[in-house]
C-alpha cells in the first residue's frame, strides 16, 4: 500500500481482514522513527469508531515502512495499491518510481476520485498496466 493517510490506512485494514499481507509505505518522517507516518496511519485505525480493523490484532498484520527504506518490498508484491494525495504530479512521480521496482506480473492500482488513469499511469512502460479504482469509503 503506497500512502498511509486516511484512505491508505483504512484500505490496509480492510485487506488484512481478508487475509492479505500488507506493507504500508509512506514518506520517511523528518525526525525520530523513520516509519512514524505509516505507524500513525495504523494507530489512527484503532481510534476510529467504528474501527475498520475487524479484530484489534489485525493492526499488527500491517507492516509499516517508508518509500525510502522499504522500496524493495515492491519487487515481490502481487498487488501495489497507491492511495497518496489527490495530486496528479505527486501520483505521476510516484508511479515513475514504481515502474523499475516491480515485477511484470504485479497488479498496479491507483485510488483516485477524479484523475484520469491515462495521465496517472503515463510514466509506466508499455509492459506494465495500471487499473483505476475508486474506493471512496473503505468498509469498516
Q: Which stretches of residues belong to each language-model region?
A:
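NAD(P)+-binding Rossmann beta1-loop-alpha1 motif at the extreme N-terminus of oxidoreductases
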Residues: 1-47, 101
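Structural motif
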Residues: 2, 10, 65, 83, ...
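Structural signal for hydrophobic packing residues in well-ordered secondary-structure cores
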Residues: 15, 29, 41-50, 81, ...
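Conserved beta-strand segments of alpha/beta enzyme cores
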Residues: 21, 61-63, 129-130
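Hydrophobic "anchor" residues on beta-strands that sit immediately upstream
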Residues: 22, 78, 107
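A structured beta-alpha segment of the ubiquitous adenosine-cofactor-binding alpha/beta core
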Residues: 44-102
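Rossmann-fold NAD(P)-binding glycine/threonine-rich loop
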Residues: 87-140
Amino acid at each position: 500500500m503506497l500512502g498511509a493517510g486516511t484512505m491508505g490506512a483504512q484500505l490496509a485494514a480492510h485487506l488484512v481482514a481478508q487475509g492479505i499481507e500488507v506493507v504500508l509505505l509512506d514518506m520517511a518522517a523528518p525526525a525520530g522513527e523513520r516509519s512514524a507516518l505509516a505507524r500513525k496511519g495504523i494507530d489512527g485505525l484503532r481510534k476510529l469508531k467504528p474501527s475498520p480493523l475487524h479484530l484489534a490484532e489485525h493492526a499488527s498484520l500491517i507492516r509499516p515502512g517508508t518509500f525510502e527504506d522499504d522500496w524493495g518490498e515492491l519487487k515481490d508484491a502481487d498487488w501495489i495499491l497507491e492511495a497518496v494525495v489527490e495530486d496528479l504530479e505527486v501520483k505521476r512521480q510516484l508511479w515513475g518510481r514504481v515502474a523499475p521496482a516491480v515485477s511484470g506480473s504485479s497488479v498496479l492500482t491507483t485510488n483516485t476520485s477524479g484523475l484520469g488513469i491515462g495521465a496517472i499511469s503515463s510514466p509506466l512502460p508499455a509492459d506494465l498496466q495500471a487499473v483505476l479504482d475508486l474506493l471512496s469509503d473503505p468498509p469498516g
